[in-house]
């Protein structure tokens, strides 16, 4: 049984593991919530999902905290009933609030519990479950340190087509002329990037100006098109990118946020990046994620508060493809492309040996 929900940062890694399990003949059941994206996304990928009633607390009104004991007890009972009905051999928590009651009841039911933490700073659910889990799987070394005997670093599961891209040495060596930049703000876009990029491009002489593909998010596409037009620059402006592997393969540089999956994909693809962490992320975990690449000279960490059109334009005009290739090679050296299979292997070992 896989438990994950709330955001794509938990659900998509869970789906990657689910597919790896399914490929080995496993029956996979998902535990999620009715209001999370997993309720529709998981069935679309062909997996059975069981739903409980539970939600996160961060940012909620004080009354939500008063109701927490009742809501948690109810969710635990629902999880217990599902566990008794489905009888999984092992339970894997991938983070997000549905994993909390499910993880608690898995342990109380005598089921082996593994948790996987995608970010460099652990989320609240995994901080709690780490104390009772049989195994703790991490995307980044050092995220959890007080359970040393139970920890294994597996990396974050990424899509196979990204992990199988040619090496940076092969890709970058064939290129000449203007840089090719990919700007990604996530499925909802990043307004700070949408504002700064067209203005920065307008400050670069036409004969030096990079080719740009800019994913804006559906809501912001019209405004982005207007901004590019007002600044007299052009680009391939899209609301959403389905096949990221193709764009990673063809670009010299990615400008993006620093979600855990983005970091894993940049490393797996082997591509240089400017990382602009979302400044309001819980516990500022995106900055911690970004440092994993920047500390290894595989990316530039650029706080949003310091990102201006002028500074970005100056950086792009002085940057060379050779420098970007070096960053891309460094990124690829940090990749863990077998992460999904590693998670499955640990699950299999735990089934065979017990908690």
Swiss-Prot record:
Pfam family for this entry, one: Glyco_transf_28
A GO CC term assigned to this protein in UniProt: plasma membrane
TM spans (from-to): none
SUPFAM superfamilies registered for this protein in UniProt: UDP-Glycosyltransferase/glycogen phosphorylase
Record carries keyword Ligase: no
GO biological process, one term: cell division
The keyword RNA-binding is annotated on this UniProt entry: no
Family: Belongs to the glycosyltransferase 28 family. MurG subfamily.
Name assigned to this protein: UDP-N-acetylglucosamine--N-acetylmuramyl-(pentapeptide) pyrophosphoryl-undecaprenol N-acetylglucosamine transferase
Enzyme Commission number(s) from the entry: 2.4.1.227
InterPro entries cross-referenced by the UniProt entry: GlcNAc_MurG (IPR006009), Glyco_trans_28_C (IPR007235), GlycoTrans_28_N (IPR004276)
Keywords: Cell cycle, Cell division, Cell inner membrane, Cell membrane, Cell shape, Cell wall biogenesis/degradation, Glycosyltransferase, Membrane, Peptidoglycan synthesis, Transferase
Substrates-to-products reaction catalysed: di-trans,octa-cis-undecaprenyl diphospho-N-acetyl-alpha-D-muramoyl-L-alanyl-D-glutamyl-meso-2,6-diaminopimeloyl-D-alanyl-D-alanine + UDP-N-acetyl-alpha-D-glucosamine = di-trans,octa-cis-undecaprenyl diphospho-[N-acetyl-alpha-D-glucosaminyl-(1->4)]-N-acetyl-alpha-D-muramoyl-L-alanyl-D-glutamyl-meso-2,6-diaminopimeloyl-D-alanyl-D-alanine + UDP + H(+)
Annotated UDP-N-acetyl-alpha-D-glucosamine binding sites: 7-9, 119, 159, 187, 241, 286
Superkingdom of this protein's organism: Bacteria
Xref: HAMAP family: MurG
GO terms assigned for molecular function: UDP-N-acetyl-D-glucosamine:N-acetylmuramoyl-L-alanyl-D-glutamyl-meso-2,6-diaminopimelyl-D-alanyl-D-alanine-diphosphoundecaprenol 4-beta-N-acetylglucosaminlytransferase activity; undecaprenyldiphospho-muramoylpentapeptide beta-N-acetylglucosaminyltransferase activity
Compartments, record wording: Cell inner membrane
Annotated pathway: Cell wall biogenesis; peptidoglycan biosynthesis
Bilayer topology: Peripheral membrane protein
């Amino acid at each position: 049984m896989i438990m994950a929900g709330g955001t794509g940062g938990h659900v998509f890694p869970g789906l990657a593991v689910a597919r790896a399990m399914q490929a080995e003949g496993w029956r996979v059941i998902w535990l999620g919530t009715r209001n999370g994206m997993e309720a529709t996304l998981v069935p679309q990928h062909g997996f059975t999902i069981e739903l409980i009633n539970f939600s996160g607390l961060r940012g909620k009104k004080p009354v939500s905290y008063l109701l927490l004991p009742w809501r948690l007890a109810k969710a635990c009972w629902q999880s217990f009933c599902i566990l008794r009905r489905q009888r999984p051999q092992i339970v894997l928590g991938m983070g997000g609030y549905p994993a909390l009651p499910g993880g608690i009841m898995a342990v109380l039911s005598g089921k082996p519990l593994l948790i996987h933490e995608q970010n460099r700073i652990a989320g609240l659910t995994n901080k709690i479950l780490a104390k009772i889990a049989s195994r703790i799987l991490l995307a980044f070394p050092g995220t959890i340190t007080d359970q040393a005997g139970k920890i294994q670093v597996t990396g974050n599961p990424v899509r196979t087509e990204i992990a199988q891209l040619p090496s940076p040495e092969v890709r970058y060596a064939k290129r000449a002329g203007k840089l090719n930049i990919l700007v990604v703000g996530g499925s909802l876009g990043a307004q700070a990037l949408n504002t700064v990029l067209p203005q920065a491009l307008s400050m670069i002489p036409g004969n030096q100006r990079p080719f740009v593909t800019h994913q804006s998010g559906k809501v912001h596409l019209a405004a982005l098109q207007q901004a590019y037009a007002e600044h007299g620059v052009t680009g391939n402006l899209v609301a959403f990118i389905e096949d990221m592997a193709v764009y990673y393969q063809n670009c010299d540089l990615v400008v993006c946020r620093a979600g855990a999956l983005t970091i894993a994909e940049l490393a797996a693809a082997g591509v240089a990046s400017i990382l602009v962490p979302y400044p309001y992320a819980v516990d500022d975990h995106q900055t911690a994620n970004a440092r994993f690449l920047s500390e290894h000279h595989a990316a530039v960490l650029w706080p949003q508060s310091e990102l201006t059109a002028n500074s970005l334009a100056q950086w792009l005009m002085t940057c060379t493809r050779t420098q970007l290739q070096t960053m891309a090679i460094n990124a690829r050296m940090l990749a863990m492309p077998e992460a999904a299979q590693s998670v499955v292997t640990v699950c299999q070992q735990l089934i065979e040996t017990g908690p």
